[in-house]
UniProtKB/Swiss-Prot annotation:
UniProt topology in membrane: Peripheral membrane protein
Name assigned to this protein: Protein translocase subunit SecA
Pfam families: P-loop_SecA, SEC-C, SecA_DEAD, SecA_PP_bind, SecA_SW
UniProt keyword Ribonucleoprotein, yes or no: no
Spans traversing the lipid bilayer: none
Job of this protein: Part of the Sec protein translocase complex. Interacts with the SecYEG preprotein conducting channel. Has a central role in coupling the hydrolysis of ATP to the transfer of proteins into and across the cell membrane, serving as an ATP-driven molecular motor driving the stepwise translocation of polypeptide chains across the membrane.
Organism for this UniProt entry: Campylobacter jejuni subsp. doylei (strain ATCC BAA-1458 / RM4099 / 269.97)
EC number: 7.4.2.8
Lineage, opening ranks: Bacteria, Pseudomonadati, Campylobacterota, Epsilonproteobacteria, Campylobacterales
Keyword field contains Protein transport: yes
Catalytic activity: ATP + H2O + cellular proteinSide 1 = ADP + phosphate + cellular proteinSide 2
Gene Ontology biological process terms from the UniProt entry: intracellular protein transmembrane transport; protein import; protein targeting; protein transport by the Sec complex
Length: 862
């Protein structure tokens, strides 16, 4: 109450921020007459003066913001016949300040972006504008290029349909580059697999504006971009696990100390499955194993867990669809098909086994990054969306981004009605159809939002039965998305859309529709996130248009059933609600919103938790990529690095074969064998007589230096340096890929440390640090071994870079272009685990000290 009183007197923090920006709007408006009276050439000349001041360092962007915004506004009037509204100027300033501008649907975010884009492109460092799909990237770039070109800026677009690096490089070399989040991220990963700086396509990460920022930085936050290559892992375990899962009986969850009946219970809140004691016994019998949870059966137990999830938590046409005998993910937030992406940890293979289609091979990660860590690389990050305030805490904590709600140019006239809640889904379905019929009879357009393909098909069939013409927009036909959405505001139109399919395309209405009450939005169930519901509501009432929105719910909807149904059901029972009747109450609507807040909180904690783990890997990634970039620099002294590595290798190998600390006893037989095997160099025991430990290390280093120089003496210095650089890069890349694999194994088993009263995150940081130290040493020592062992003639030396690029290209062509995350280990994978990797069983020991003890010995070279 006291807080509300303070807000009434002083206004909210958002109100105060907006007032500050309005003061500057007045100053910009005062300049309008000045620039309006200039000719085109004079206006361009004025702009060039400001640009020179930025490039010379005489002034910074904030110093010239008022003039530049006024010039951009005038340019918009001349080239597009569009004038930036005052509230759009505020949006532009918010973006320039590296914040999120929350602007309602139809408020012209595309035009708003031109203001900070132009201002920040003046430095010549490049500006990126990110959208959610190719259509929007191309459309926005083409529409706004008139402003940019008038002011002397080049505009490029990065599209997934472009096959060549040349096209991408040309786009990135432009002053302003539009594209999708996926393409920007993948180009970054691919750039860090190149063998020369000239082949890279991206420039520095200067300033980025992310359109639909909530979709990309929140909804997609758990979806890493992965470039992966094929691996040879057995898939039989998924088939066996699927057969066993089909024979297991589902039981009902009970509170301890009672024991659940059945073979397993499903926890829908946490999206998990728990196998009961009876279920374990049955599974062991069906698999023909004594102990399902013994270390040798750990992979099989995991595959059974995924099979049970596939059958009980993932529905066809809700979470995935079958197309051309392939399992394709349905994006839970947009309803679009996520072609090329695969569920992680073997779940996708479990779904393929469930649907009896070909089980695709698991893959090995070559490079990966999350959107969270990719976009945090930019010097300045900003975003636009119609819905951000509900996630303001997450934007602040994860990305250090403040959210500013921008007032609408014309007040919103849309009526947001309270929810109608029914006891059963069938009652709700019938009520929705009746409401559609009423609106359709008078010609009022209706947009029906559904949460899944399955639900959209239900309404499609019911409307077809009633002979009501309509369009269905879901993952199965998203190719026609923009056209269907554009027509959704026409008289008599009925459009069924899965979630927020068609986002980014405005639904425009004419005067006749305005007289009928505008577009009618009907939500058929609440989403887990209030933000997604707000996006659906926001399709109506653009730029002061009238409109109506209402949600129709039932106690059988997933959200209410799992998180809030009991309380609402008791309210309905007390009120004596009969079958077919609904309840409309602010109390019930608040109860629904509280259920949504619970889910949002769970998801936020989940994303935050995942980021804590990913930050560990991200620091390592940045270190490796930074070092890789140093190697690509022609001025980098690779020969000095090799000499340093030879010295470290010599010290390391000499220590390995010392029988005591004095150095008087050295196992020279094994030392000679190792040096001959790894460095193709013969050494004599006499060379080391009467030397101290340090002197012996130096002597070995000197011998290897001489041997290496002699080996490479027939090559020209320039060629030699290039060979050294490429071979070093190849070693770094190979070791890094194996390290990513080891990190995946570590992450898979680290959760079990919690049972030993240890914090899994702390343990993960410690273990991953140790793995990284091993990686650094392996890069040093493996590069030495490769440089000593490689044999080639002059022609081969000249073609080395081309060959390396060809091999890289093959890897990229066979890679998975998008992934939910790296898949888990296949059955019998213990045989393939590197000896120094953490054991997959989760014991915390290295594989060679755990399940790898019985593996092959390494002989005298160990």
């Amino acid at each position: 109450m006291f807080l509300n009183t303070l807000k009434a007197v002083f206004g909210t923090k958002n109100d105060r921020e907006v007032k500050k920006y309005f003061k500057r709007v007045v100053q910009i408006n005062a300049l309008e007459g000045k620039y309006q009276n200039l000719s085109d050439d004079e206006l361009k000349a004025e702009f060039e003066k400001f640009k020179e001041q930025i490039l010379s360092g005489e002034k910074n962007e904030n110093d010239i913001l008022n003039d530049v915004f006024a010039i951009v506004r005038e340019t918009g009037k001349r080239t597009l016949n569009m004038r930036h509204f005052d509230v759009q100027l505020i949006g532009g300033m918010v973006l320039h300040d590296g914040k999120i501008a929350e602007m309602k649907t139809g408020e012209g975010k595309t035009l708003v972006a031109t203001l900070p884009v132009v201002l920040n492109a003046m430095s010549g460092k490049g500006v990126h504008v990110v959208t959610v799909n190719d259509y929007l990237a191309k459309r926005d770039a083409e529409q706004m290029s008139a402003i940019y070109n008038f002011l002397g800026f080049s505009v490029g677009v990065v599209l997934s349909s472009q096959n060549s690096d040349i096209e991408h490089k040309q786009a990135y070399d432009c002053d302003i580059t539009y594209g999708t989040n996926n393409e920007f991220g993948f180009d970054y990963l691919r750039d860090n697999m190149k063998f020369s700086k000239a082949e890279k396509v991206q420039r520095e990460h200067n300033f980025v504006i992310v359109d639909e920022v909530d979709s990309i930085l929140i909804d997609e936050a758990r979806t890493p971009l992965i470039i992966s290559g094929p691996t040879n892992r057995t898939l039989d375990g998924y088939i066996k696990a699927n057969e066993v899962a089909k024979q297991m009986q589902k039981g009902e969850a009970v509170l301890p100390p009672e024991k659940p009946e059945g073979d397993f219970v499903v926890d829908e809140k946490n999206r998990s499955v728990l196998i009961t004691e009876a279920g374990i016994a049955k599974a062991e019998k069906l698999f023909g194993v004594e102990n399902l949870y013994s270390l040798e059966n750990a992979i099989l137990a995991h595959q059974l867990d995924q099979a049970l999830k596939a059958h009980n938590l993932f529905e066809k046409d809700v979470h995935y669809v079958l197309r051309n005998k392939e399992v394709i993910i349905v994006d839970e937030f947009t309803g679009r098909l996520s072609e090329g992406r695969r569920f992680s940890e073997g779940l996708h293979q479990a779904l393929e086994a469930k649907e009896n289609v070909k089980i695709q091979e698991e893959s090995q990660t070559l490079a990966d990054i999350t959107f969270q860590n990719y976009f945090r690389m930019y010097n300045k990050l900003a975003g636009m969306t119609g819905t951000a305030q509900t996630e303001a805490t997450e934007f602040s904590q994860i990305y250090s981004l403040d959210v500013i709600s921008i007032p609408t140019n014309i007040p919103i006239k849309r009526q947001d009605k309270d929810d109608l809640i029914y006891k059963t889904q069938n009652e709700k379905f019938k009520a929705v159809i009746e409401e559609i019929k009423k609106a359709n009879a008078k010609g009022q357009p209706v947009l029906v939002g559904t949460a899944s393909i399955e639900r959209s098909e239900v309404f499609h069939n019911m409307l077809a039965k009633e002979k009501i013409p309509h369009h269905v927009l879901n993952a199965k036909n998203h190719e026609q998305e923009a056209l269907i959405i554009q027509d959704a505001g026409k008289k008599g139109a009925v459009t069924i859309a899965t979630n927020m399919a068609g986002r980014g395309v405005d639904i425009k209405i004419d005067d006749e529709i305005r007289a009928l009450g505008g577009l009618y939005i009907i939500g058929t169930e609440r989403h887990e996130s209030r933000r997604i519901d707000n996006q659906l509501r926001g399709r109506a009432g653009r730029q002061g248009d009238p409109g109506i929105s209402r949600f129709y719910l039932s106690l059988e909807d997933n959200l209410l059933r799992i998180f809030g149904g009991d309380r609402i059901k008791s309210i309905m029972d007390r009120l004596g609600i009969e079958e077919g009747e609904s309840i409309e109450s602010r109390i019930v609507t608040r109860a629904v919103e509280n259920a949504q807040k619970k889910v949002e909180s769970l998801h936020f904690e989940s994303r935050k938790h995942l980021l804590e783990y990913d930050d560990v890997a991200n620091e390592q990634r940045k270190t490796i990529y930074r070092y890789r970039n140093e190697l690509l620099d022609e001025n980098y002294d690779i020969r000095a690095k090799i000499s340093q590595n030879i010295a470290e290798y010599s010290a390391n190998v000499m220590n390995d074969y010392m029988l005591d600390e004095s150095g008087s006893n050295v196992n020279f037989e094994n030392l000679k064998a190792k040096i001959l095997y790894e460095c193709s160099t013969q050494i004599s025991e006499k060379d080391f007589e009467n030397l101290s430990v340090i002197e012996m290390q130096d002597k070995l280093s000197q011998i290897l230096e001489n041997s290496y120089n002699e080996k490479m003496s027939r090559l020209e210095i320039k060629e030699l340096r290039n060979i050294e650089r490429i071979l070093y890069l190849q070693v770094l890349d190979n070791v890094w890929r194996e390290h990513l694999y080891q990190m995946d194994i570590l992450k898979t088993g680290i959760g079990l440390r919690g049972y030993n009263q240890k914090d899994p995150l702390v343990e993960y940081k410690k273990e991953s640090y140790n793995l990284f130290l091993e990686l650094v040493n392996r890069i040093k020592f493996d590069s030495i071994k490769l440089l000593f062992s490689v044999q080639f003639n002059q022609q081969e030396a000249q073609n080395l870079e081309n060959k390396a690029n060809e091999e890289n290209e093959k890897l990229l062509q066979s890679s998975v272009e998008m992934g939910a995350s790296e898949d888990n280990l296949g059955e019998a994978e213990f045989k393939k685990v590197p000896r120094n990797a953490p054991c997959p069983c989760g014991s915390g020991k290295k594989f060679k000290e755990c399940h790898g003890k019985s593996g092959p010995k390494q002989g005298i070279l160990a």
